[in-house]
Amino acid sequence: MRFALAITTLIAAVTAAPSGHHGGKDLHKMTLGQAGDRCGADQSIYCCNEKTTKIEHSSPETGLGGLLGATVGADGLLSHLLGTCTKIPVNVLAVGNLLQSECTNRAACCHNTPSVAYGGLVNLALPCVAIGSLIQ
């Protein structure tokens, strides 16, 4: 009885373990069109550089984000986490270009509307998600 339980537990653990295959496209082979599909209709593709910002405690833009070590800029981006982000234009001619050729750093999906959080007890706006975390 215990042997059967041990074998059943082992089989369940092996089948539940994540595989090395992501199921989706590799980030290095992803085109701008595929990245745009991953982002969705209400988001745009941004290329985020290394973290070059510094936290200024006297700035009005640092609220709770400043306490957590992230500066929320005027555009609503968490600059400390993703760095300085610039929008990658996706037009008809560039849809087939590889994402890696357009952005050698971190690519992210960001909301088109400015992310602003006001009037609540905890005001935290998270407008961007790294594209690498969307690939499964």
Swiss-Prot record:
Gene disruption: observed consequences: Leads to complete ablation of slender rodlets on conidial coat. Significantly reduces conidial hydrophobicity, adhesion to insect cuticle, virulence via normal cuticle infection and dispersal potential. Does not affect radial growth and multiple stress responses. Impairs significantly conidial tolerance to a wet-heat stress at 45 degrees Celsius.
First and last residue of the signal peptide: 1-16
Induction remarks: Under normal conditions on SDAY medium (Sabouraud dextrose agar plus 1% yeast extract), hyd1A is increasingly up-regulated from 562-fold on day 3 to 1742-fold on day 5, and maintained at high levels afterwards. Hyd1A is the most active at transcription level under normal culture conditions, followed by hyd1B, hyd1E, hyd2A and hyd2C in order.
Tissues of expression: Expressed in aerial conidia, in vitro blastospores, submerged conidia, and cells sporulating on chitin and insect cuticle, with hyd1 expression peaking in growing mycelia.
Superkingdom classification of source: Eukaryota
Keywords, ordered alphabetically: Cell wall, Cytoplasmic vesicle, Disulfide bond, Secreted, Signal, Vacuole
Record localization: Secreted; Secreted, Cell wall; Spore coat; Vacuole
Disulfide bridge partners, by residue number: 39-109, 47-103, 48-85, 110-128
A Gene Ontology molecular function term of the record: structural constituent of cell wall
Pfam families found in the cross-reference section: Hydrophobin (PF01185)
Keyword Disulfide bond among record annotations: yes
Protein role: Aerial growth, conidiation, and dispersal of filamentous fungi in the environment rely upon a capability of their secreting small amphipathic proteins called hydrophobins (HPBs) with low sequence identity. Class I can self-assemble into an outermost layer of rodlet bundles on aerial cell surfaces, conferring cellular hydrophobicity that supports fungal growth, development and dispersal; whereas Class II form highly ordered films at water-air interfaces through intermolecular interactions but contribute nothing to the rodlet structure.
Official protein name in the record: Class I hydrophobin A
Species this protein is from: Beauveria bassiana (strain ARSEF 2860) (White muscardine disease fungus)
Originating gene: hyd1A
